[in-house]
Amino acid sequence: MGATEVLTSYCVVLCLLQMVALSSGHFTVIGSQRPILATLGGNVELNCQLSPPQQAQHMEIRWFRNRYTQPVHLYRNGKNLHGETMSKYVERTELLTDAFNEGKVILRILNVTVDDGGAYHCVFKDGEFYEEHITEVKVTATSSDIQILMHTPNIKGVMLECHSGGWFPQPHMEWRNSKGEVIQATSKFHSQDKNKLFNMSMVLFIEASSHRNVICYFQNLVTHQEQSINIVLSGELFSWKIVWIMILSTISFVMIDFCMTYCVQQQLIHEESLSTVDNDQCESDQSEGTCYKRNYPWIIIAVVPIISVFAIIGVMLFLHLEQRVTILEQHFELDTLWLEDISVILCVVIVSNINLIPLIYFRLHEHVPRFKDRSPILNKAVVFLHFIYFSIVCGTILLVHLQLRNKVSISDSLFSLYNSWLTDISMILGFLLSIFIVTTIAKSSLFNKKWCIGLCIHMKEAEATGGPCEGEEL
């Protein structure tokens, strides 16, 4: 036997052994080692093949997920058995058999949903022998629908809300400035709809005009796709600061101007009275209880507007720093609206009660003669009326509070806001009541001393002329 015949015999034996091995079902299944990305609503193809390549038409090919008995797609005896597949995959899968001769199959899944994500088992079965390969599918959805909602600017600042829906999986979201630097979000929220898609929302509360260009940024953590939208904030949105500074400055300027004018007037009257009144006589009258030597009136007069300014500043700071609701709560905007309205009302109340009402009162003293001899009674009446007025207001607040307790449940967040406001207003009214009474008494005391000096002058003139002074008034 020659060498050629020996080599030929060896090749024949090797081929026979290979055919025996193939007929006995010795093979492996290979496929993609990386996750397959599937776009939501699109189609995805999963492939696997035999190694070594061989005919697969006579084999059973099964694709399943968690349970072997619940196939996604089943091919057996040369047919696709759709009746044995999972109901949600009926008419949604196709098995591409163009490369059956090479042992390669492709499963196409149509109209991908969020539930299609996960592991898929590809099984080739030849007789009793089978092998499988596992392919992972990741479903992704990226949305370009991003909206920024800007709430009405209020006394505390500007609130921005960024919304975007239709994401999967949950994306990364953040606020950025024009330089790409991250701005800490006030809050972040997310929810899932019936299709298990994520609806994202985040809030940014800007208290100052430091961020003029704000970017709402989203990123899909699987595909690394990015979506963003920006908003440019005008400086006019923060004009509320200038408005409030102008209001407080105007109030302070008016009160200080009134104070200075009135102080100069009273000082001139004081100096004129000192030049005509015998100090010794007034001191003797003072010892008898008929006259009081007047001190410099501008000290008391100057204290009143100063108290007014500090009262306004104190009340405004108290209302603004008091945290009745957090920014994240649904009634935050309602709280800021009430804060704006009540701040204006309190400014008017403080200015009118501390300055306007006493001014009218003292003008009546000067120009209506019958008020002069009743000044002590009127002084007490003013204080009493202040007390009655604030008592009525506090009583009304208490009644409203009791009615709210009966109408609104304790767990209601709106009731908590009402209760906080009622408590704060009650404290402020008590504080203002004490301020009003003190300023009224101070001004009344000043007026009595002024009237006393006038009486001393009149008595001095009556004594010099020899006429009677009893019962006469100035």
UniProtKB/Swiss-Prot annotation:
N-terminal signal peptide: 1-25
Disulfide bonds: 48-122, 162-216
Keyword Signal: yes
SUPFAM superfamilies per UniProt: Immunoglobulin
PROSITE patterns registered for this protein in UniProt: IG_LIKE (PS50835)
Residues in Ig-like V-type domain copies: 27-140
Tissues in which the protein is found: Expressed in skin, thymus and, to a lower extent, bladder and testis.
Location in or out of the cell: Membrane
Family statement: Belongs to the SKINT family.
Additional observations: Encoded by one of the 11 copies of Skint genes clustered in the D1 region of the chromosome 4.
PANTHER family: BUTYROPHILIN, SELECTION AND UPKEEP OF INTRAEPITHELIAL T-CELLS PROTEIN 2-RELATED
Protein name: Selection and upkeep of intraepithelial T-cells protein 4
Underlying gene: Skint4
